[in-house]
Amino acid sequence: MRVWIAGIVVCAVLPLAATAATKLLPAEIQSTFFDGAEFTAATPSGIRFKMTFSADGKVRRVPTGNGGARSEGSWKLDDNGYCTTWKGGKPNCFTVVAADKNKWSVMKGPAVIATWSK
């Protein structure tokens, strides 16, 4: 009976591991996004921005619709991902997780704060 229950638990857990999202390493974030090429960011509430992270450590966001604020700041890599500091703001650090083909989730702890797409 115990073997049977253990088998069910293993079968239930294995598919979850196979679909677990892949966290990007800081170097992968830099090579994928921080090359000066513009890409799209969308917040969970639907506000969209064109984002540009330059190789020199500068970042810019421009809203593409209603809502959101245009801003500039700086970025740097850290041990787990990257950090941004917007003008007049404090540093915030994030991780990036592959979500789908050409889509990535920007995470602040367990919360998705944006979806990036190319």
Give the label of every model feature segment.
Residues M1-W4:
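Positively charged n-region of N-terminal signal peptides that target proteins for export
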Residues A6-P15:
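Bacterial N-terminal signal peptides
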Residues L16-E72, K76-K118:
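Lipid interaction determinants
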